[in-house]
């Protein structure tokens, strides 16, 4: 609404009275409050221009306590490793807090293949004059079965299905077994996709 947009402008202009929590949706706010309580942290309301001290990651489970028996299925999901999330933050320790680069980092982390939620908030640092970053993420369920087919007349002109792990070993890499058939050929084999080769924003795709 108008109030949120006014607050967004205030924060973008780095003005006093900026409330970063007011810019979050309900699910994001709840996740951040839970992470703050878990780590004993407090929001830094004026991080701009301060050097970054630490980057701390809290990665929430796919199924939360409120989802009852579904929590059992968490054992079949490899939660994204903290170091994998941490390296996506473009502002590095020792550099000044830059909200534009923080926002870009958040957009990278919110890749829907891997995350349903990603928030980066400034928190008070133990180092005088510095600010720490608290990164809160929540994975999506990563085991997938995909199927696609096209029919011409009474036969398949194209057929493919795959079983994939979209977050292999918690590394944000995709590994799949794929069957693919068209009118001219049949193929079966593994598929590997890495969207962050050697920590850089390159994509590696191989079959």
Regions found by a protein language model. Give the residues of each.
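Immediate N-terminus of the mature polypeptide
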Residues: 1-207
């Amino acid at each position: 609404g108008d109030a949120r947009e006014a607050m967004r402008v205030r924060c973008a202009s780095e003005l006093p009275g900026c409330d970063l929590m007011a810019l979050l949706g309900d699910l994001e706010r709840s996740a951040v409050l839970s992470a703050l309580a878990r780590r004993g942290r407090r929001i830094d309301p004026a991080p701009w221009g301060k050097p970054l001290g630490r980057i701390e990651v809290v990665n929430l489970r796919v199924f939360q306590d409120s989802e009852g028996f579904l929590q059992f299925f968490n054992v079949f999901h490899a939660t994204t490793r903290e170091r994998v999330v941490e390296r996506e933050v473009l502002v590095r320790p020792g550099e000044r807090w830059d909200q534009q680069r923080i926002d870009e980092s958040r957009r990278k982390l919110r890749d829907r293949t891997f995350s349903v939620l990603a928030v980066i908030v400034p928190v008070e640092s133990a180092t005088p004059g510095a600010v720490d970053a608290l990164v809160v993420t929540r994975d999506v369920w990563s085991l997938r079965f995909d199927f696609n087919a096209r029919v011409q007349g009474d036969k398949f002109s194209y057929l493919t299905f795959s079983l994939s792990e979209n977050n292999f070993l918690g590394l944000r890499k995709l590994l799949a077994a794929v069957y693919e058939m068209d009118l001219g050929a049949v193929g079966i084999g593994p598929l590997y996709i890495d969207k962050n080769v050697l920590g850089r924003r390159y994509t590696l795709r191989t079959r």
